[in-house]
């Protein structure tokens, strides 16, 4: 497929303009978009804010390579850009992330028969939320799977905490986003307890992520401590 302007690049994929309405997301290393596309189509049916897909999402109906996904072009800044521009506060960003997690976990699992399992994003942070005129839209579903909601909260918290524990200019605002997110935890999410299975599993996954830099990996222990510090006490 012929592509236009490169709009953005992540750790594993690039996004190209097709026209004013559609973009092409293409994996660089042979990744397969089929599973993520099926989840996005399912979530859209349940009213969750994801980009529209062009054409059927099922693997048997696809005409593009399995590395390519054609989806709605979203107009507006990412939540991270809005935070840096001052159009939303850190407290608002954290609350919106929490709301998106709560809404996602209210949708029944697509495949699992375990009633405790839900669809998980596993990479929900401010740069994966687009602020459009119609509201926030969640992008980048390449890591999605099904499991306990606490794992999704743990991954989001840990991603934020790694930035907040660093010494970059982003540390202070992201710390405030993290604090806001943690105040909105559900009553069963004991994320401040580093012995809880979900947060420990999140740390294990982050440590094993080959896309993380050595400096990011070294921040994991400090990030875990910061989550403990910022999580409000539960009754």
State the predicted function of each range.
Residues 4-36:
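ATP-binding glycine-rich loop module of kinase domains
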Residues 21, 68, 119, 136-137:
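Hydrophobic "anchor" residues on beta-strands that sit immediately upstream
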Residues 44-57:
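Conserved HxN/HPN-centered segment at the entrance to the catalytic loop
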Residues 44-47, 80-122, 127, 136:
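Conserved kinase catalytic-core helix
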Residues 55-97:
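Conserved structural core of kinase catalytic domains
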Residues 76, 158-235:
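Helix-rich C-terminal or lid/interface subdomains of diverse kinases
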Residues 129-131:
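Hydrophobic residue at the +6 position relative to the catalytic HRD Asp in the kinase catalytic loop
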Residues 135-173:
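Active-site Asp-x-Gly
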